[in-house]
Regions:
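Acidic, proline/glycine-rich low-complexity IDRs
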Residues: 129-160
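Alpha-helical repeat scaffolds
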Residues: 34-49, 75-94, 118-132, 157-160
């Protein structure tokens, strides 16, 4: 596994840990919260300029960056611009990416940023092809994340 892919997978892991901190019923300690936030922010910024010509690796990079920038509370004023840049990168590869768990996860995080209905439809189309009797824990978690984003579209508002 190459360096940028392993860094992307590590960022996905740490961002997931931060996003779900305390969800297991364990207390949240401020030092752990601050450490994880800083770690995710530093990893996100260091990985931001990494790009790959391999579609799946680029998808993992985009997913990691969206997860990272969403999870952390830190922002030096350019986080929204960086997220938009990552969304642009993701859009460039989504059509080429084969139907897979990775694609559903990337569609889910892109949808969570812009709430574009076509992203949601694409994710559900892939999920509908999965064997519901043999779902992996990752597939079930991704389905739950998508459902959560669909039902809680904060801070999304329809402007009149």
């Amino acid at each position: 596994m190459n360096s940028s892919l392993s860094c992307a997978l590590e960022l996905q892991h740490v961002a997931h840990e931060l996003m779900y901190l305390g969800m297991d019923g364990e207390p949240i300690y401020s030092d752990t919260f601050c450490r994880l936030n800083k770690d995710v922010f530093v990893k996100s910024n260091s990985l931001f300029s990494s790009k790959s010509s391999d579609i799946e690796e680029e998808a993992n990079l985009c997913l990691a960056l969206l997860m990272g920038y969403n999870a952390t509370i830190y922002d030096y004023g350019d986080k929204e611009q960086k997220k938009q840049s990552v969304l642009d990168r993701a859009y460039n590869i989504l059509e080429q990416l084969p139907a897979s768990l990775l694609k559903v996860r990337l569609l889910t995080y892109c949808y969570g940023e812009i709430y574009e209905e076509s992203l949601l439809q694409d994710a559900h189309f892939i999920i509908d092809q999965w064997d519901k009797g043999a779902l992996t824990s990752e597939q079930m978690e991704t389905m739950e994340e998508l459902k959560n984003i669909e039902e809680n579209q904060y801070p999304f508002e329809v402007l009149q």
